[in-house]
């Protein structure tokens, strides 16, 4: 009896080792193939080649379960051997093996039933339980394997579907003379797909996205559809869709289906004409989403949700949790009301809409500006500007950009350093007018070396002029690049290319004096109320004074020119200032802001200053 027990244990260990060696050989073969493909692309050398490492084979103990990679060809071959002929193999979902009275494989796979009456019923999940007896061989010399149970449907065994054992016996008899099928016979190209079935599948996916947090679309018309079976099911649909903005687009929709245990996962890509590509994913049922949102059987086509999703895609917003996303969505909704109010009360031609600041609170947005308030009780430290009188009529328009006196639009990032960009822009313009050379000077030097201002926590142009004078000048941007945070000052006086003797204050509230100074000297540093700039998209901005008070200056910018927009059909003329901002070229009009000229809109002439070069 002891001898029999010992023999049984030895047999079980032998089975585990044999199975482990088989899969180890396959994995090693794959690794060797990868290595050979890599070596083929490299130049050979005369160096000695080291011996390949010894592969350690894991021996399974009785009852121990080992999960197998779905990508192993051997596992796929086993599954395809016992899959009914009426079904096309798609991919392995899950697989494991264990030592029992042999090697027991349990494989969960995704397949297509080619005999399904309704296309929507073609996608199925099969679970196969297969017993391998390696001490037995088939007539072709392969290891003997037999099907234990299967929940796959097949017309030949439907009559015994309720009896798993009988069903397995019939399937074994059916496949006893069947050789392994090639994956090339199964995986095909795009084939035409029933349009009604495609429309139903698309509608189901859209319902899930609407119920969750995805984009929102409505189907208008389906033109054509196709399917491709690979390691999953790719359904491609050509259709007209209406998005959350109530705009109709011709779109190609790709639905990539992966079937998993107890839930399915779909990756959906919307490629609409003249629109950015939108990608989404859903992994839960409509019923689950309905319970979550408490909107059972009443999915609301929410325009705001759709706009918020497009905002996330365009500006790359990623939120750390669902709670944060919901908070940002609430802020976004409130900001849409502000945008609506700005558009309704706009007296110029400006359009306000969704910008990168659309999910920020007012306080968060203010952190992206950074201008301190002047203490009106104290002297600024600057001299009163002597504005040269312009002889003759002032030009209708003027732009220092056309005179090569304005550098490219810069981006201060998530740092309240507008004051530094306003000052360097002013000095860059003055230097270009004086020397004929347009150079970029360093804002980072001011963040690091100006001890009066507070780097990313804000500052004042008045202080920056004084700091440059005391420090000894400015280095070039390339020599002292911008980091959007305060670091240790490492100013190199030998690399100072421009020096400042002081600064001047232009007459407060006098926009004609600003024009004359601009024409004679160069761009002007100003402070402005940035309320209307948060959602500015273009046009001449002329908001109500109640929405943009001249007293609340919070942003430092640069006036580089002026002009006039004429609207003869409406008998309307809009004079404006051309303002260079520091939020990058994607904001506003390629980084610029046109604000109404003539009534001190948003305090444009309240804090106008300019450096005096040494």
From Swiss-Prot:
Propiece residue ranges: 21-393
GO annotation, biological process: proteolysis involved in protein catabolic process
CDD domains found in the cross-reference section: Peptidase_C1A
Cysteine pairs bridged by disulfides in the record: 415-456, 449-489, 548-602
GO cellular component, one term: fusome
Any matching Pfam family: Peptidase_C1
InterPro entries from the UniProt entry: Cystatin_sf, Papain-like_cys_pep_sf, Pept_asp_AS, Pept_cys_AS, Pept_his_AS, Peptidase_C1A, Peptidase_C1A_C, Peptidase_C1A_papain-like
Low complexity bias spans: 29-45
Catalytic reaction equation(s): The recombinant enzyme cleaves synthetic substrates with Phe and Leu (better than Val) in P2, with high specificity constant (kcat/Km) comparable to that of cathepsin L
PROSITE patterns in the cross-refs: THIOL_PROTEASE_ASN, THIOL_PROTEASE_CYS, THIOL_PROTEASE_HIS
Keywords for this protein: Disulfide bond, Glycoprotein, Hydrolase, Protease, Signal, Thiol protease, Zymogen
Region forming the signal peptide: 1-20
Ranges where the record places region Disordered: 25-50
Residues listed as glycosylation sites in the UniProt record: 151, 492, 510
Protein EC: 3.4.22.41
Active site (UniProt): 418, 555, 581
UniProt keyword Disulfide bond present: yes
Annotated GO MF terms: cysteine-type endopeptidase activity; cysteine-type peptidase activity
Family according to the record: Belongs to the peptidase C1 family.
Biological role stated in the UniProt entry: May have a role in autophagic cell death.
PANTHER family attached to this UniProt entry: CYSTEINE PROTEASE FAMILY C1-RELATED
Protein name stated in the entry: Cathepsin F
Organism: Drosophila melanogaster
Gene designation per UniProt: CtsF
């Amino acid at each position: 009896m002891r001898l029999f027990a010992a023999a049984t244990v030895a047999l079980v260990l032998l089975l585990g080792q044999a199975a482990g060696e088989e899969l180890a050989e396959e994995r090693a073969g794959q690794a060797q193939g990868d290595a050979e493909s890599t070596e083929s692309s490299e130049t050979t050398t005369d160096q000695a080649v080291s011996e390949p490492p010894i592969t350690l084979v894991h021996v399974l103990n009785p009852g121990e379960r080992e999960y197998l990679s779905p990508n192993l060809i051997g596992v796929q071959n086993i599954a395809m051997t016992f899959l009914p002929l009426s079904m096309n193999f798609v991919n392995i979902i899950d697989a494991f093996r264990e030592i029992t009275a042999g090697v027991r494989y349990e494989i969960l796979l995704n397949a297509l039933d080619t005999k399904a009456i309704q296309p929507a019923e073609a996608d199925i999940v099969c679970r196969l339980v297969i017993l391998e007896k390696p001490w037995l061989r088939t007539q072709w010399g392969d290891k003997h394997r037999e099907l234990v149970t299967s929940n796959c449907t097949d017309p030949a065994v439907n009559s015994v579907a309720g009896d798993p054992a009988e069903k397995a016996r019939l399937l074994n008899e059916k496949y006893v003379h069947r050789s392994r099928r090639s994956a090339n016979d199964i995986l095909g190209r795009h084939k035409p797909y029933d349009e009604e079935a495609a429309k139903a599948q698309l509608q189901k996916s859209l319902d899930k996205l609407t119920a969750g947090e995805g984009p929102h679309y409505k189907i208008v018309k389906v033109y054509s559809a196709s399917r491709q079976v690979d390691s999953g099911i790719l359904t491609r649909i050509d259709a007209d869709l209406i998005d959350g903005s109530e705009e109709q687009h011709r779109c190609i929709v790709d639905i990539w289906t992966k079937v998993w245990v107890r839930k399915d996962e779909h990756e959906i890509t919307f490629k609409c004409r003249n629109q950015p590509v939108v990608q989404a994913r859903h992994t839960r049922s409509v019923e689950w989403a309905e319970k979550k949102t408490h909107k059972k059987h009443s999915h609301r086509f929410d325009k705001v949700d759709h706009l918020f999703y497009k905002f996330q895609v365009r500006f790359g917003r990623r939120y750390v949790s669902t709670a944060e996303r919901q908070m940002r969505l609430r802020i976004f909704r409130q900001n849409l009301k502000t945008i609506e109010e700005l558009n309704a009360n706009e007296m110029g031609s400006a359009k306000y809409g969704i910008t990168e600041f659309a999910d920020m609170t007012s306080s968060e947005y203010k952190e992206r500006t950074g201008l301190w308030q002047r203490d009106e009780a104290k002297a600024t430290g600057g001299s009163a500007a002597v504005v040269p009188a312009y002889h003759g009529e002032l030009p209708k328009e003027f732009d220092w950009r056309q005179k090569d006196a304005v550098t490219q639009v810069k981006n201060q990032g998530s740092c309240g350093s507008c004051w530094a960009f306003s000052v360097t822009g002013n000095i860059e313009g003055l230097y270009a007018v004086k020397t004929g050379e347009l150079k970029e000077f360093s804002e980072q030097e001011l963040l690091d070396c100006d001890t009066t201002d507070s780097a990313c926590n804000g500052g004042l142009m008045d202080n920056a002029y004084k700091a440059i004078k005391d420090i000894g000048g400015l280095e070039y941007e390339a020599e002292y690049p911008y980091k959007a945070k305060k670091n240790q000052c490492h100013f190199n006086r030998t690399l100072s290319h421009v020096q400042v003797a002081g600064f001047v204050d232009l007459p407060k509230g006098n926009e004609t004096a600003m024009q004359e100074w601009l024409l004679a000297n160069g761009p002007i540093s100003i402070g402005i109320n940035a309320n209307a700039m948060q959602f500015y998209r273009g046009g001449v901005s002329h908001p109500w004074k109640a929405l943009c008070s001249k007293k609340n200056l919070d942003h430092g910018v640069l006036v580089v020119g002026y002009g006039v927009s004429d609207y003869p059909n409406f008998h309307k003329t809009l004079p404006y200032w051309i303002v260079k901002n520091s939020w990058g070229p994607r904001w506003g009009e390629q980084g610029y802001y046109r604000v109404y000229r003539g009534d001190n809109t948003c305090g444009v002439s309240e804090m106008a200053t300019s450096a005096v070069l040494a």
